[in-house]
Swiss-Prot record:
It holds the Pfam family Homeodomain. GO terms for biological process: positive regulation of transcription by RNA polymerase II. The gene is zen. Coiled coil: none annotated. Residues 69-83 have a biased composition (Polar residues). It comes from the Eukaryota. This is Protein zerknuellt. Gene3D superfamilies: Homeodomain-like. Keywords: Developmental protein, DNA-binding, Homeobox, Nucleus, Transcription, Transcription regulation. GO terms for cellular component: nucleus. One of its GO terms (molecular function) is RNA polymerase II cis-regulatory region sequence-specific DNA binding.
Length: 373
């Protein structure tokens, strides 16, 4: 029977420190200085005196490695806990389309909710009260940002337009608005703004129709001037309007290069439409200037055509009525009048002057006298 000897680590009991007589005489500090060296020598001597077996050394080495591994495993345990904490963070709430529609409708009716209404909406939509509260906060912030962005876009678009173009459009609008005023007030304001109208090259002045000439001759025959003074200044006013029309048309031809997408149909009432478009363009002239100017241009062209037709028609009719072939008739021939436009400064004064000149002619004298003889 072979005897196997097992070596176990030897546990040495620490012996109590020996108090010497010198320590009592010289004090505690002297013994304290000597005690660590004596204990250190004692432990070194005891460890060196006991020879260790190789198996014991291997056992101690494995135990030391296990302790190191356990300490190394404990080190990354803290980041893993942090990752778990990050994963436990609240995820973003994904609202369904039905919930979003209900919340938007509630926001349109009321931007701020009191607590009872918030709880009611949360229960109806199967949401938390906090989720409803946060959604309304975010929606209010988005609403404010949209308003600020819209204002900034308007301001930037207005600043981007050149100052000269803005002043030119304002001048056009003021002219169009002045056409819808009374002709005497418009003429007075034009004379105040432009005192040197006679020096500037104007359109050729149209000669007075034969009706006005005949009226003046009959008035001199009776020795009375019955024609109102508005009949003669109306021609100057019309020439001024025609010159302003030509200037505006030239400016519009230069400023509008691309054709407009929307065209306003020309109608009989041309003056009020021009005034209304001028007022609307004065409010929003910095955005759709091209469209507004194109429509104004077409309205002005239609107005000029109507004005020229209304002026040329009665002249031809009067020339035919005063022809020598119609001397034998005892009654005044019928004169075809064009339908006057709604604009006072373009059509009405000329029409009124023609009516006045015809009404003051004595039918007996007109039928009995032959001016050629």
């Amino acid at each position: 029977m072979s005897s196997v000897m097992h070596y176990y680590p030897v546990h040495h009991p620490t012996a109590p420190p020996v108090v010497k007589y010198s320590d009592l005489l010289y004090g505690h500090h002297h013994s304290a200085n000597l005690q660590p060296t004596s204990l250190q020598n004692y432990t070194q001597h005891s460890v060196s005196s006991i020879p260790e077996h190789p198996s014991l050394q291997q056992h101690h080495h494995q135990h030391h490695q296990q302790q190191q591994l356990s300490s190394d495993e404990n080190l990354p345990s803290q980041p893993s806990q942090d990752m778990q904490r990050v994963k436990l963070k609240r995820s973003r709430t994904a609202f369904t389309s039905v919930q979003l529609v209900e919340l938007e409708n509630e926001f349109k009716s009321n931007m701020y909710l009191y607590r009872t209404r918030r709880i009611e909406i949360a229960q109806r939509l199967s949401l938390c009260e906090r989720q409803v509260k946060i959604w309304f906060q975010n929606r209010r912030m988005k609403f404010k940002k949209d308003i600020q962005g819209h204002r900034e876009a308007k301001a930037s678009a207005k600043l981007a337009q050149p100052q000269a173009e803005q002043s030119a459009h304002r001048g056009i609008v003021q002219r169009l608005m002045s056409y819808s005023q009374d002709p005497r007030e418009a003429a007075a304001s034009a004379a105040e703004k432009r005192p040197a109208v006679a020096a500037a090259p104007a359109a050729p002045v149209v000669a007075a129709p034969p009706v006005v000439a005949a009226a003046t001759s009959t008035a001199s025959f009776y020795g009375q001037a019955k024609i109102k003074p508005q009949a003669i200044p109306s021609n100057n006013n019309n020439s001024m309007c025609s010159s302003d029309l030509s200037e505006i048309l030239e400016h519009l031809a230069q400023s509008t290069a691309x054709p407009a997408a929307t065209v306003t149909p020309p109608g009989p009432s041309i003056g009020p439409t021009c005034g209304s478009t001028g007022v609307s363009s004065s409010g929003h002239y910095s955005y759709n200037v091209d469209l507004v100017l194109q429509s104004i241009k077409q309205d002005l062209e239609a107005a000029a055509q109507a004005w020229s037709k209304s002026k040329a028609g009665p002249v031809l009719a009067n020339a035919q009525s005063w022809h020598p072939s119609g001397v034998g008739s005892s009654s005044v021939p019928a004169v075809s009048h064009a339908t006057p436009s709604m604009n006072l400064s373009w059509g009405e004064p000329a029409a009124k002057s023609r009516k006045l000149s015809i009404s003051h002619i004595n039918p007996c004298v007109a039928g009995g006298y032959n001016y050629q003889n």
